[in-house]
């Protein structure tokens, strides 16, 4: 961390609900956690100053304000926006991490711009080729991490192994699992299943000798059954799965609402089952894990949903603080270093095996 006090730069501009909702979320996070941490609120001073005063945020001495005059909108092209809006709240927040003023950046803004800005400005860790976006997914018996859900749609097989390290460390922090069991998403659980990317990655996982607690392939049919703590996939597949899941939940809610409104008997039934619905909400960690970290960078970048409300912003701040306090970045670097040592050892063993084979062939000849 930049110092002994964890510091988060929060970009309060560019979200669907506007800066006020995010500022209220910051206030809720400060109210629920009285420990020693800092929040730098980044945004257009003319817009955010009245809101900070209205909601008594500046009375907390853990809050600082950083002025940024521009906003990257949701529909802007990421690279073009980065070049033309150099004083955007998002890029200024990332820069605060780059120079060491903050340890993490949290934003609800343009996902592409956040990923591009984070990757270009902060760079990937040594040994990590591409960052990956990880998120907590609710399961039938327990929650699990899915990674990657959108950062790298067409990765190399080696990157999927890297993603397992990133996801396992996030599972340790977010879910409290000491030795997360990792599965590789495929179209079946048999060793012969999967495309060339999955097949090659599957072989690499088997050869990594214990750095990752690898359990094998998992298919979509068993995704939510709790067999694995981390599910690894490419960013294209992960994004499709995530959006399909969100769409399915929304469809279920809409259909349920329509059916309830058909009869007063159904409405009465909902009142009777109110306790069950409250318990269902507790099992779905929408607010608690609303921030998805972009893992593998030299600095923590956390993406919250564009329509995140105040509770979800407070939850995203909470999980970001947990990542910082648990020294997740350092743990990732250590595991990546261990993995690379094993990879080099395996290569050397293979070269030695080939050399001996060649010598035996020459002797026989």
Regions found by a protein language model. Give the residues of each.
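Glycine-rich phosphate/nucleotide-binding loop
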Residues: 119-146, 227-231, 235-345, 352-353
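Phosphate/nucleotide-donor binding subsite
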Residues: 57-102
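N-terminal phosphate-binding or glycine-rich loops at protein starts, especially the Walker A/P-loop
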Residues: 1-49
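Short beta-strand segments
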Residues: 11, 41-43, 66, 107-109, ...
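A glycine- and small-aliphatic-rich helix-loop capping segment at beta-alpha/alpha-beta transitions
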Residues: 25-29, 57, 113, 117-134, ...
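Short glycine/serine/threonine-rich phosphate/pyrophosphate-binding segments
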Residues: 18-22, 48, 86-100, 104-118, ...
């Amino acid at each position: 961390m930049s110092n002994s006090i964890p510091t988060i730069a929060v970009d309060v501009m560019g979200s669907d609900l506007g800066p006020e909702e995010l500022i209220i979320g910051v206030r809720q996070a400060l109210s629920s956690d009285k420990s020693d941490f800092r929040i730098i609120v980044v945004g257009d001073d003319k817009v955010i100053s009245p809101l900070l005063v209205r909601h008594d945020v500046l009375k907390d001495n853990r809050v600082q304000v950083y002025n940024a005059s521009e906003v990257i909108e949701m529909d802007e092209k990421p690279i073009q926006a980065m070049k033309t809006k150099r004083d955007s709240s998002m890029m200024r927040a990332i820069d605060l991490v780059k120079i060491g003023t903050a340890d993490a950046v949290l934003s609800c803004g343009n996902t592409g711009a956040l990923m591009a800005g984070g990757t270009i400005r902060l760079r990937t860790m040594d040994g990590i080729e591409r960052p990956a976006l990880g998120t907590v997914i609710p399961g039938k018996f327990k929650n699990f991490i899915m990674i990657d859900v959108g950062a790298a749609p067409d990765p190399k097989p080696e990157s999927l192994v890297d993603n397992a390290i990133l996801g396992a460390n996030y599972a340790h922090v977010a879910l409290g699992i000491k030795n997360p069991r990792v599965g590789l998403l495929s179209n079946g659980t048999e060793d012969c299943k999967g495309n060339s990317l999955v097949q090659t990655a599957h072989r690499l996982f088997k050869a990594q000798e214990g750095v990752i607690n690898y359990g094998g392939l998992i298919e979509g049919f068993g995704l939510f059954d709790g067999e694995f703590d981390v599910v690894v996939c490419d960013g294209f597949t992960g994004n499709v799965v995530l959006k399909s899941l969100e769409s399915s939940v929304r469809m279920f809610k809409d259909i349920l609402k329509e059916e309830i409104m058909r009869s007063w008997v159904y409405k009465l039934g909902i009142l009777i089952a109110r306790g069950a619905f409250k318990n269902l909400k507790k099992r779905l960690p929408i607010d608690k894990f609303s921030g998805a970290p972009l893992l593998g960078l030299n600095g923590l970048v956390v993406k919250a949903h564009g329509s995140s409300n105040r509770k979800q912003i407070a939850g995203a701040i909470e999980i970001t603080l947990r990542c910082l306090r648990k020294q997740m970045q350092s743990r990732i670097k250590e595991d990546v270093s261990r993995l690379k040592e094993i990879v080099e050892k395996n290569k050397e063993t293979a070269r030695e095996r080939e050399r001996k084979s060649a010598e035996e062939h020459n002797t026989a000849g």
